[in-house]
């Protein structure tokens, strides 16, 4: 082998390693995931299956990918709640859907609702869930402060009837209103 051939091979090898490293750096490897069964809440007639939300680890945080149907069109508050329960409970003498889930998950004691990337807000605050006119939701949302599946195991996913302004004003907890659908994260 002559010197020119050796030099060409060496340059080619170095370039190949550089391209491989650049490609590896720009991809998002799919990590571990959990599939959560979601039900529309009805404390009187019983809950009804509406699909799943798959939670996946990524380099940028947890990704929540819904595969839901039969929901009302529009933006809906979407949160991680404290307890692994979607059961109804009584509040002020009235059976309330999903109350067994507790409040928004707030392990750091922020005591305020906010944006999913806001450090001084509930850790369970997620981007709003978009439901299309046909009642389906398939658009993933990213929770950048949540990094590992173990962060959310033993809690629940909650979808509220109304949207979410990511503030406690003018209405508390983003104004999402009643609990519409729920799933326990196992």
From Swiss-Prot:
Sequence similarity: Belongs to the Cu-Zn superoxide dismutase family.
The record's subunit annotation is:
Homodimer.
List cystine links. Answer: 86-182
Q: Which Pfam families match?
A: Sod_Cu
User: What Gene3D superfamilies does this protein's entry cite?
Assistant: Superoxide dismutase, copper/zinc binding domain
The answer on whether this UniProt entry bears the keyword Oxidoreductase reads yes
> Main role?
Destroys radicals which are normally produced within the cells and which are toxic to biological systems.
Co-factor binding details = Binds 1 copper ion per subunit. Binds 1 zinc ion per subunit.
The reaction(s) annotated as catalysed by this protein in its Swiss-Prot or TrEMBL entry are: 2 superoxide + 2 H(+) = H2O2 + O2
Its name, as the record gives it, is Superoxide dismutase [Cu-Zn]
Domain of life assignment: Bacteria
Question: Does the keyword Signal belong to this entry?
Answer: yes
Q: What is its EC number?
A: 1.15.1.1
InterPro entries given in the database record: SOD-like_Cu/Zn_dom_sf, SOD_Cu/Zn_/chaperone, SOD_Cu/Zn_BS, SOD_Cu_Zn_dom
Record's subcellular location: Periplasm
Q: One GO MF term, please? A: superoxide dismutase activity
Write out the residues that bind Cu cation. 79, 81, 104, 160
**GO cellular component terms, A-Z:** periplasmic space
